[in-house]
C-alpha cells in the first residue's frame, strides 16, 4: 500500500479526526508554557512587535516593517492587533496568533501527508510529531513574535497547497518573502520538484509559475508604495528616520559568505553544533537557550537515535529510488520538504560563513519540517515489515527525546512556577514612581511593553522607537538610568538592577542618506539577561 496514490486509500473520517485531535493537543501542550507564562521566553525583539500592534490599534502609527528596519514585514503585529482589541495587551495575547499558526502548520502537514503521500492518518502522525513536539529550544522560537520564525514553515505549507492556484501561491510567496526571506527556499524547492515530476515542463505549468511570480511582484510593489507612508521608527516617523536602509533582497544578498574556505567548517558545525541543539539531542540547560527554567533538554547518546532515524530513512529512500527509477506523485511533497530543508541548511552555512551557534538557531528552523518530509518519504516507499517497524520505533524514540523535556518544563511551571524577574523590574520601577528612564536595548522595550507604556524606557545603544528618546529627554528632570551593575551614585533595586542618576544622552544625529551612515548593530544579549 505504500506509495499508492491517496485516491486509492479511503481512510475513515473517524481516523482523520482522531489523528488531528491528537496532533493538535500535543502542539497545544508543548506551547502552553511559552504562550501563557510571560517569563518563559520573552525579550525586547518580541516586545517591539507587541508595541507595533499596540500603536496600530491606538491609531498612533502605521507600522509596516519591524520598527527600525526596512525589511521583516510586521505580519505578527497585524495578527496580534485584533487579539489586543478583544483580550487586552499582554505577552500571551501577542503570542496567541503564533499558537494558531503552529496548530495550522501541524494540520496542513498531517492532511497533506494523507492526501498527497497516501499515508494513513495514524501513520502520518509520526512524521508530523517532529514538528508538533520539537525540542524546547525550537518550540520557544516557533512561538516568539520577533520577525518570523515559524512563518517560513507556514509559507512552505501554503505555497505547496496553492501551487495549482498561482495567484494565491504568488501572494503567499510575496508576503512570505517580505516577512522572512527564507520563504525563497520553498519557491526554489517547488520549482525543482515541478521540473522533476513534470508540471514545469509543460506550457500550462510554465504559465502557472509566471502568474505566481507576477502576483508576487505585484505584492512587492504595493508594499514598496505603502512603505513611504509607514511609521518606520515608531509613532510620528517615516523611513527617513532610519540611519540605515535595506530590504529583503538586500538582506539575502548580504548573507553570502565570500570565503569558500569556511564552507567545510560550516558543514562540520551543522552536524556537531546546529543539529544537536535543533533536534534536542545535546544535553543543555534551558536557561542557556534563553528559556527561564531550571530544566534541561537533551540526553547523552541521543544523537545516535537521531543519526539512525535519519540515516536509515535516507538509505531507504535512496535504495528505493535507485531500484524503481520512476517518480511517483506520492514522492513530490516529501521531496519538496526535504529540498526546503537542504536549501535552508546551505543558506545557513553560507550566510553565517561557517560560524553556527545556538544564538542564531532561528535562522535555520526549516530542517524540522525537512525531517518530517524525509520520514514520510521513507514510510511511503517502505512496505510493512521488520525494517519499517524498527525504524518507527527509532522515530518514536526520537520524539521521546524532545517530548520528555517538554513535559518536564510544563510540570515545572505548573508545580513551581519560576520567578518572573522581568515583571519584578516593572514592579520595582513602579513602586519608586519611575516613569522615564534610559536603558540598554534588551531591557528598554521589554520593560516598556510589560508596563503597557506606563513606564517609558528609551534604548541608549540601539534605537527602534525614536519617540521614546524624545519623551525621556523631555522629562530629564525625573528620568533615571537603569543598569545591570554598579553605577556611581546609583542604588541597587534588586539583583541585576541598579537605579542610576540621569546622564544626558547625545542628541540623535540627523538622518543620513540611505546607506551612508549605518546605525549600530543590536548589541549582544548579556548572558542570562533579564
Identify the function of each model-found stretch.
Residues 207-305:
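Membrane-lumen/periplasm interface segments of specific transmembrane helices
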Residues 20, 24, 96-118, 138, ...:
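Transmembrane-helix motifs of polytopic, lipid-linked glycan transferases
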Residues 19-24, 121, 125, 171, ...:
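Signature aromatic-anchored transmembrane alpha helix within multi-pass, membrane-resident enzymes
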Residues 154, 179, 185-186, 298-309, ...:
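Hydrophobic/aromatic-rich transmembrane helices and adjacent perimembrane loops
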Residues 5-6, 186-220:
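Perimembrane helix-loop-helix junctions
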Residues 117, 154-169, 176:
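Membrane-interface transmembrane helices that cradle and orient dolichyl/undecaprenyl
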Residues 34-44, 58-95:
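Membrane-proximal lumenal/periplasmic loop motifs of glycosylation machinery
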Residues 33-36, 77, 91, 95, ...:
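Aromatic- and kink-enriched transmembrane "portal" helix at the membrane-lumen/periplasm boundary
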